[in-house]
């Protein structure tokens, strides 16, 4: 019997495809273009950094890629779903299925314990089961090194510990993409480095795509890809790291 060998390689999945994205805002006297005709493709499992000067529009771009906001023009596909013509309710369903968020300000509910904060995204799912959600949340807290702080509220946690809770919360619904907007901006330098390494470690372990918006070029250069938003254009820097 003759064996037939396929020469077709398994190509990495394009998880985000943006074509000619444009964002404009209307001011009282004029229309301001934040950026125009931006295109990029991001593969599943990649670590991607977006940098830029303050006011360059990098957080605006993240909001569009993460389906939080709608672009003025262009085409966006996230996890195989065309976003550009969806309304807010439909975009929210895309986020619920595919996306987790880590913010600079942690955004934990102060009256809930760490484990309760981590469980929050699962409460939005129709199949929510408390016991299963709690077990998954406890497992994630262990993964981020906070199993002993599970029953503590945010006010007794350090900034780094609160961000670890936020990272666990971002992962609880098993998203395909994590968007992190200045995730270490409120932390001291040592804690910031620890959180950065945790994000990279979880990216490698779980295969989740990581998209960072940061002003820190040292952090950006640790990512597999580094884009800079400059004068309304997106420039990809050649990778220099290992």
Feature roles, as predicted:
Residues 1-24, 236-242:
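ABC-family P-loop ATPase nucleotide-binding domain
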Residues 15-16, 21-222, 226-229:
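ABC family nucleotide-binding domain
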Residues 226-238:
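H-loop (His-switch) and adjacent beta-strand-loop-beta switch element
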């Amino acid at each position: 019997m003759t064996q037939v060998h396929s020469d077709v390689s398994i190509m990495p999945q394009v998880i985000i495809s943006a074509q000619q994205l444009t964002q404009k805002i209307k001011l009282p006297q004029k229309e301001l273009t934040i950026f125009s005709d931006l295109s990029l493709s991001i593969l599943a499992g990649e670590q991607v950094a977006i940098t830029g000067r303050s006011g360059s529009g990098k957080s605006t771009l993240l909001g569009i890629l993460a389906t939080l906001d709608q672009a003025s023009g262009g085409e966006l596909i996230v996890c195989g779903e065309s976003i550009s013509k969806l309304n807010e309710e439909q975009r929210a369903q895309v986020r619920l299925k595919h996306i987790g968020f880590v913010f600079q300000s942690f955004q934990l509910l102060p009256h809930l314990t760490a484990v309760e904060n981590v469980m929050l995204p699962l409460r939005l799912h129709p199949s929510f089961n408390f016991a299963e959600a709690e077990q998954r949340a406890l497992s994630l807290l262990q993964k981020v090194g906070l199993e002993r702080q599970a029953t503590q509220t945010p006010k007794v946690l350090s900034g780094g510990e609160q961000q670890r809770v936020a990272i666990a919360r971002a992962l609880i619904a098993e998203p395909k993409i994590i968007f992190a907007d200045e995730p270490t901006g409120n932390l001291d330098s040592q804690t910031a480095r620890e959180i950065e390494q945790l994000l990279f470690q979880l990216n490698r372990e779980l295969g989740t795509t990581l998209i960072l918006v940061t002003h820190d070029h040292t952090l950006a250069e640790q990512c597999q890809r580094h884009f800079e938003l400059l004068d309304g254009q997106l420039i990809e820097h050649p990778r220099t790291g290992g």
